[in-house]
Structure formats: C-alpha cells, structure tokens
From Swiss-Prot:
Gene3D superfamilies tied to this protein: 3.30.450.40, Histidine kinase-like ATPase, C-terminal domain
EC nos: 2.7.13.3
Protein name per its UniProtKB record: Sensor protein LytS
SUPFAM superfamilies reported in the protein's UniProt record: ATPase domain of HSP90 chaperone/DNA topoisomerase II/histidine kinase (SSF55874), GAF domain-like (SSF55781)
Source species of the chain: Enterococcus faecalis (strain ATCC 700802 / V583)
Annotated function: Member of the two-component regulatory system LytS/LytT that probably regulates genes involved in cell wall metabolism.
Amino acid sequence: MVELFILMMERVGLIILLAFLLVNVPYFKRVLLSREKMSSKVQLILIFGLFAIISNFTGIEIAKNQIVPNNLLTYLSSNASIANTRTLVIGVSGLVGGPIVGSAVGLIAGFHRVIQGGGHSFFYVPASLIVGLIAGFLGSRMAKQTVFPSAGFSAIVGACMEMIQMIFIFFFSGDLSDGATLVRFIALPMILLNSVGTFIFMSILTTTLKQEEQAKAVQTHDVLELAAETLPYFREGLNKNSSKKVAEIIKHYTKVSAISMTNSHQILAHVGAGSDHHIPELEVITELSREVLRTGRMTIAHAKEEVGCSDPNCPLQAAIVIPLFSHQQIVGTLKMYFTDPAQLTHVEEQLAEGLGTIFSSQIELGEAEVQSKLLKEAEIKSLQAQVNPHFFFNAINTISALMRKDSEKARKLLLQLSKYFRGNLQGAVQTTIPVSQELEQVKAYLSLEQARFPNRYQVTFDVEEAVASEKVPPYAIQVLVENTIKHAFGSRKENNQVRVVVKAKQHKLHVDVYDNGQGIPEERRLLLGKTTVTSEKGTGTALENLSRRMANLYGSEGCFLIENLETGGSHVHLEIPMEQEELDARINR
C-alpha cells in the first residue's frame, strides 16, 4: 500500500501540471475565465478529456493485489485493474466547468477505460458519468456567482467522488470478495490522494487568479491616479512644458528606466536614463520613433539594435513606443524605455497601450478647450469647460472607491466614463447638442452616483421620441439632475424620486426636472440662477452657469425657472426655442 501511495503521488503531479497550464498559458486562461460560454465548455471538455485519457495510460496496473511494473498501459489482461487519477480529473473538470463538462469528460474517460480492457470494466462508464455529473452540479452553483469552489470544499468533493468509484468497484468487479479485496488494497491511497490532488489543483487556480485580480485592481487604481494628475497638463496642449511634467508623473508611477515624449518631429521631453543625448527640442533621433510616426501603430523593441539610437553608449536596451492621436491624426509619441530588456513584460505592454488611449483622449480634450477659447462664443465655451473637470474628478473618486471592493464593476464604470468623455469631446466645441446625446451623459452620471449610493435615488425619464434630435445646451439637463441629486433630499436615504420630462410645446422644447425632496428656502430660490449662493453644500455656480448660457444663446426667447411644488419638492423648468429646420421637420411628420 505504501508503494502504491508513492506511485500515485507521482501521477497527481500530472494534475498539478494541468492547473499550471490553465492559469499561466493565456489561451487556456481565457477559456477558463469564460467557462459559461458553450464554446469554452467544448474546449474544456477536450482539455480535461485528454488529461483523463493520459491518466488512464499512466495508471498503475494491479493484478492479484500486486503492483505490475509498466510504463504505459495500452491494454490490460482480464484479471488486472488500474489505480489512477482518472476520477480526480473528472471531478475537477466538473467543479470547474459544470455538469456538461463533467459528464462529457466522465464519458470520455469511462469509455477509454473500457477500451483498455481488464476484468468487468464496463461499470467504469456509469461510474465516471455519475462522478462528473455530481461534481458538475456542485461546481455550477459557484459558476453562477463567477467564482471557483474553495480548495477545502473541493477536497471534500474529491474524496466523495473517489468513494463513489470504490462503491462501484466493490459491487461490480466480479465476485464481492474480489471487489472487497481490491478496494482494501487501493481505497485509502486513492481516496486520500484524490482529495489532496483536488485541494492542490483548486488552490493553484483560486490563489493565482485572486492574486492577479488584486494586482489588476492596484494597477488600475494607479492608472486612474496617474490620469487625474496628467489631465491638467494635457489641457495645456502637447508642448515642452506639459510633456516634461507628464513624463515625470509617468516615471513616478511606473518602473520604467526613462520616459520620452515627442510631437510629430522633435523631442519634447525626456526623463531618466539617456537624458544626456535624448535632449528636448532636438529632432526625433531613433528609427523606432520615426516608424511609429509613419505607421501609427504601437511598436516594441526588445534589443538595443531595435531601439535604433545613434549614440553607441546609450543605456536604453528596450522600448515601447505608443502613438498619440488627436482627432484620428498622429500628433506625437509616448516612449517607455528600459535599461534591462527583462523589465519589458506583457504587463508593461498593456499599461503602455492603455496610457496611450487615455492620453490621446486628454490631448483631444485639451485641444478642444484651446480651440474653444478662439471661437466667437468665448464666454459660452469657457462656461461649458467648467463642467468637465468637476464631473471628471467626482467620477475618478467614485471609481477609486469601488476599485478594491468590486474591480469588475469599477471596470464597467470606467468604460461608462470613457464613453461620456468621448461624447463631451464633441460637445466641447458645440454650443448645442442633440437631446439624445445629452441624456446619454445624464445616464452616465447617474450610473456613477448609483454606484456610490445604491438604491438611494429613483430617476425616471419621460421623453418624447420625436424630440431626440432637438438641440439643447451641453450639460443643461445634467446640471439640473446633478443639482437635484446633491441638494434636494438632504440626508434622506430612501424614497428619493426624480422625474425628467422632455417634450415639445408651441414651437419650444420644454425640459422639466421634478423631485419629491424638501424644497428650497424662498430667499435662496429667488437667488438661484442669478448669482452665487453661499451654503454648506454648494454655491449655486452650476445653475448660474446654465442660466448665463441660456441667456447668451436664446435671449428673451429662452426660459429658466425654479419653483417649489405645493405637494413638496421642487421643479426646475427650461424652455428652449426649436430651430426653424426642426420645426419644419415636425410639421411634415
């Protein structure tokens, strides 16, 4: 029995190899993490089925309670049996992939065991199928929660699955006396090692994925902080001063040896190793950078020769060069240099690609703000630009707070924020935008607020379908909704209702925002929208901002009204003249 135990431990190593492949090879990891998809289930069946067959081939032949030396078991005599890790593979496949994967792997392993031969081997098919189904149903409960079973729970399941196998061997291995003899010889090593093997497998799986998730959360948190710090500088445009500050910030947050930034023809900043000859204001000196400027694709150099620096003493041995875009045109590059090529890993590549996307958006935002200052409607543009940073920093704080609690939810909110700012890049150079676009921005804001305060606010929208293309000032509805959320309800944590109504009446677009809050003190209501109002929670600047923009755009034809409701709460009303072409379109509908 001791010899069998030692030999079985060697076979368990095969399962450890499988766990290593699943969490370290990118292809297998993608299949594992998308296991709810049918295509992934098929691939898991093939992977685990292959390892189950290998377990049969590498099993330990036993005849008359004696271990028969053999390297590869392709065929068994009629009086022989096998001690192997087949049940371990089947059980793990069910825990990871669910009942479909578990039962399919069980059938593959069972039929292959029958093909190998040996006395009374047909019972291995139903035994393997039952093991796969039970383990699969136990694992599917966890899959619905997007987590894997714990190692301890899996170890208990593994032991139970092997016990089921022993019961089948006892009753169906010919005479009961033969079955009992075989079970006494193999039961303890196989049950114990099946449990230990399952424990080790799931430990590797859960621990590695958890550590990776934590690392991603920390990295995303750092990237958000980095983006928040670089935003003010990119708003100045891509120039020597802003590039130097941005390069210093990036180097502080990353482990790179040097950071360099260029425009389309010259070096704007270089911080770190190689700064003695990578001098700002010189022309771009590396062939690598020139190639990226030509092609517009991220390029990676893993050797000094690929970097292409003309200085023979340059310490830079590897690099990632990312193109920076503005309005789909290449405006420069961001370069991350390494003095040791081993420092350039897949993590750095993903980080660089993400930073390139963020910085390109920030450059576009900065250019939009610069252009807005040159437009005739300078006052309107400057008022609009005041809203952007305010919302951005609120959103960053919300996502940062979620990062360590629910990184997946934070990722989705970050995508919402990205979509929001992509739309704002258009609104930043326009005096009006479609109602549909404005409502998308409002919903992006609300998704972030609901993340901070789940179920605190109930917001409903009553919007005529025909007004979706009508024009409103950027941020008009968002300012009203945001002001209501922040000030209407005080410390009340439930039954906070907001209703947004957008309809066309008498050649004008009517926007109404109602709430069931505590109302507005009369002396303050008379001042809101006309001047700043000192209070503990704000100054009323946003409403004054909107009122001034309405006046500049529409003059006496526009309307901005704030009132208290007799039933409690408040009501803010906007009237916006509809453009003549929009009126004609409505008449002809």
